[in-house]
Amino acid sequence: VQRRVSPPIFAPPGAKTSPNWAIRLYEAADEVAWAAKLNVFWILFTLAGGVLFGVGPATVAAYTLARRRAMGESFRSWPEFVSAYRREFVRGSVLVLPLAAVIGLLVTNYHAFPALRLPIAVALGFLVVIAAYALPMAVHYDLRTPRLFPKASLFALTRPASSVLLLFVFTAVVFVSTTFPFLVLVLAVGGWIQLDTWLCLRFFAENEAKLHAKGIS
């Protein structure tokens, strides 16, 4: 991504500067409100599918809108979420349900077998990172579902710093959510999806720039 940097402009002594803090505060509040809206949509449509058949398409639909938001698009959130939910109903279930099942099994074993907690925690962390890459990949690239997990795994292994950052952010979200459980209903899921998407789009752009510099398309 190319950025143009303008020459610095210095205000004369005594001149009033623009209230940048107010603008930043507004932008931060707008992002929190958006994450809360995304959270509500995710919960409603997960429940609409009876949880089991709703969580997959609701998750992929949320990532679809999060990507569009991160790329600066303007859209009507409710009809676009409904459209994405219907469009991704089958693929979302195929993508998310196996991930949720394996993560649930690992969490159960983590609590059931104290002696194996370290290897289980490592496996759980790696799977979380793979999911954190795979879901944004699913809505950003034209990839078939069977290719998503190998691609996400390779990306996780070749970009360790980015993977550690994603795992840190996810752990922070989980910690805050367990400390304040009401956030799960208000903000946690939508906030994580938007943060994950925002970070991954930048990781993808950096990777594409490196490949382009090497002459690899």
Sequence positions of predicted segments:
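Helix-coil boundary and N-terminal low-complexity module in membrane systems
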Residues: 1-120, 128-178, 182-217
